[in-house]
């Protein structure tokens, strides 16, 4: 769903505004050629400003379970096209999150509410900061010209994150729409490893959009946009994002030491290193990308008590922080954490006990339970649900924990799947996997990001683009 959320807020049809008026636009959304959803945008404008209401819908299911996602978003702009306020309601598999924000001076004050979470935060805006839902208005209002390029600071409302967006108007291109020739500008956008192309007309209407991950949208009539013959299944999404290696990995859960070649990689620093994962070689290619060779070992069995690790990262307060997804201060999470830590055990033993509890008490189902509290209440979920609940319980117990996103080998699919797992600091960082019940992750766990503000976007750099080969050391 992260990928879908990002794509849903890249662009909408956005007209130029004169006097007063309103209009409605529809886009049909496809993933690798298969219809999966639509976007409806209704824009109203007057001398007092602009109001845009949008609805994004993705029809998804996992076996017989409805996993559909709907996002309703209202953005208000002042007459000079600056953000005034916004409201956002996301419903993913029946789970709701609401975000409301209002500008005061150069600061956005926003409030995020979901089950077991209600918190206000503030973020500063600069002259270059625009909301992701309406940023095309800012581009089109100044006029479009081939060769024009620039940068914008983009606030992603669904994730409450700031990212830097680079854009360039590449060319003009004529498209056919309902038997008519439409002149468009082709705009390339890049942010955090993700690249999109948008075909937009002089009046700001988006006729086509595509990403380097296989998503596409096309302007359609309402009845066409809403016609979705069959729900996109999570298994089909998994299959399409699967990374097939050069050969199957035998006994992956008992794999302790492997060497990988991964390409294309955008920079020598794109893949992180840690105590398990070391980069051996980085080779620059003619296209400017890199081949990264790295050696990955399974997590060690024991804590190294003979050497005190010099690692100040465990002191970062974000590793004990409560978030909208990890409600570590909720009374139900706190009560379970106290129950699991009742025997006065060591932090490492407590982390292992929490790992086992989450593994045994959550059914392994491909349903997105969105938050730690959802996972605890429903007792089911996929890797992200397991990781969120584990992280909430360890943070509630005072154990610094970070969330890792990367790849892991699946014997069932004979390839690498995108996966989430936690790392805990218990004198040193240790990687665990509550989904698989591993106190020490195996060598097929390839870390691509760890929880920093932009880590979800950094993961987009790899999805649908990389190839992997492996060998023994």
What are these regions (language model features)?
Residues 132-137, 300-302, 306-381, 452-457, ...:
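Secondary-structure boundary elements
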Residues 4-13:
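Hydrophobic h-region of N-terminal signal peptides that target proteins for export
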Residues 201, 213, 217-231, 312-313, ...:
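Active-site rim recognition segments
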Residues 114-135, 354:
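Acidic/charged, solvent-exposed loop-and-adjacent secondary-structure segments enriched in E/D, K/R, S/T
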Residues 171-173, 185-186, 194-197, 280-281, ...:
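Generic recognition of flexible, low-complexity loop/linker segments
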Residues 30, 339-424, 428, 440-443, ...:
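Active-site neighborhood of thiol-dependent amide/isopeptide-bond enzymes
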């Amino acid at each position: 769903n992260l990928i879908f959320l990002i794509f849903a807020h890249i662009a909408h049809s956005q007209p130029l505004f004169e006097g007063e008026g309103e209009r409605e636009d529809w886009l049909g959304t496809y993933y690798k050629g298969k219809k999966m959803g639509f976007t409806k945008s209704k824009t109203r404008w007057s001398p007092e400003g602009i109001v845009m209401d949008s609805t994004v819908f993705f029809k998804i299911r996992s076996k017989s379970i409805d996993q559909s996602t709907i996002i309703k978003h209202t953005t208000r702009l002042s007459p000079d096209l600056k953000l005034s306020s916004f409201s956002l309601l996301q419903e993913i598999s029946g789970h709701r999150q609401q975000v409301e924000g209002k500008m005061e001076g150069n600061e956005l004050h926003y409030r995020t509410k979901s089950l077991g979470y209600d918190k206000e935060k503030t973020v500063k805006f600069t002259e270059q900061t625009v909301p992701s839902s309406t940023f095309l208005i800012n581009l089109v209002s100044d006029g479009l010209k081939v060769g024009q390029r620039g940068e914008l600071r983009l606030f992603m409302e669904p994730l409450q994150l700031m990212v830097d967006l680079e854009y360039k108007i590449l060319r003009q291109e004529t498209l056919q729409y309902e038997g008519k020739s439409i002149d468009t500008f082709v705009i390339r956008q890049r942010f955090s490893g993700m690249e999109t192309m948008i075909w937009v007309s002089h009046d700001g209407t988006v006729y086509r959009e595509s990403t380097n991950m296989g998503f596409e949208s096309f302007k359609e009539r309402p009845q066409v946009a809403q016609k979705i013959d069959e729900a996109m299944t999570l298994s089909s999404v998994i299959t399409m994002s699967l990374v097939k290696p050069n050969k199957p990995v035998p006994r992956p859960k008992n794999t302790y030491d492997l060497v990988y070649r991964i390409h294309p990689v955008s920079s020598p620093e794109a893949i992180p290193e840690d105590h398990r994962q070391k980069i051996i070689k980085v080779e620059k290619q003619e296209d400017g990308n890199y081949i990264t060779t790295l050696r990955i070992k399974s997590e060690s069995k024991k804590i190294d008590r003979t050497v005190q690790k010099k690692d100040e990262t465990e002191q970062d307060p974000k590793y004990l922080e409560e978030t909208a997804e990890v409600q570590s201060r909720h009374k139900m999470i706190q009560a379970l954490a106290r129950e699991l830590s009742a025997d006065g055990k060591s932090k490492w033993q407590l982390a292992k006990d929490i790992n086992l509890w989450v593994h045994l008490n959550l059914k392994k189902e491909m349903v997105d339970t969105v938050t730690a509290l959802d996972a605890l209440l429903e007792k089911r979920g996929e890797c992200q649900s397991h990781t969120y609940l584990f992280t909430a319980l360890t943070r509630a117990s005072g154990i610094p924990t970070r969330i890792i996103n990367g790849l892991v080998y699946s014997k069932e699919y004979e390839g690498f799947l995108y996966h989430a797992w936690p790392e805990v600091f218990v004198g040193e960082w240790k990687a665990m996997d509550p989904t698989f019940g591993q106190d020490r992750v195996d060598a097929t766990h390839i870390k691509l990001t760890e929880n920093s503000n932009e880590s979800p976007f950094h993961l987009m750099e790899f999805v649908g683009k990389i190839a992997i080969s492996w060998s023994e050391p």
